[in-house]
């Protein structure tokens, strides 16, 4: 009886420890979403002068792992080049982005106006697109096909 009691007790303790460690882990993502996820809203003009009102804007790109596998990335900043450095300009500080198209092998140049009024010209560091929600559904606008993006 004593051995059986010890086995049941050990199983109970193992279950309690497992539950105690899993509850905080399952609550963490919800906490992070409540604190840091700001939704961005922008008016986007494409190369054909079509304007789209986008909500929940993200910069989207796919990292190629193999010929058939990709890792999707949704960012709330713009990865641009400044010399040899990659600079991540947060959407929070951006007022407007004007896109100057380049050749097929050269990334487009972004003329970025910050909310502070400062401006700069930067080549895009990673080929990607702006994704968001419009009144008609989800929209994916490649950066090389854009003219302007104005954050609201």
Q: Whereabouts are the PLM-identified features?
A:
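Compositionally biased alpha-helical segments
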Residues: 28-152
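N-terminal secretory signal peptides that target proteins for export/translocation
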Residues: 1-6
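Bacterial N-terminal signal peptides
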Residues: 10-24
């Amino acid at each position: 009886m004593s051995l059986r009691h010890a086995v049941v007790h050990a199983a109970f303790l193992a279950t309690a420890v497992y539950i105690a460690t899993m509850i905080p882990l399952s609550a963490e993502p919800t906490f992070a979403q409540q604190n840091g996820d700001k939704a961005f809203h922008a008016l986007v003009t494409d190369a054909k002068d079509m304007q789209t009102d986008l909500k929940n804007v993200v910069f989207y790109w796919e990292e190629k792992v193999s010929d058939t596998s990709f890792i999707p990335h949704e960012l709330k900043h713009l990865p641009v080049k400044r010399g040899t450095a990659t600079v991540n300009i947060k959407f929070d500080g951006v007022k407007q982005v004007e896109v100057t198209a380049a050749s097929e092998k050269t990334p487009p140049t972004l003329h970025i106006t910050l909310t502070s009024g400062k401006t700069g010209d930067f080549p895009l560091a990673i080929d990607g697109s702006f994704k968001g929600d419009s009144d008609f559904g989800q929209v994916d606008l490649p950066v090389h096909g854009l003219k302007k993006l104005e954050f609201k």
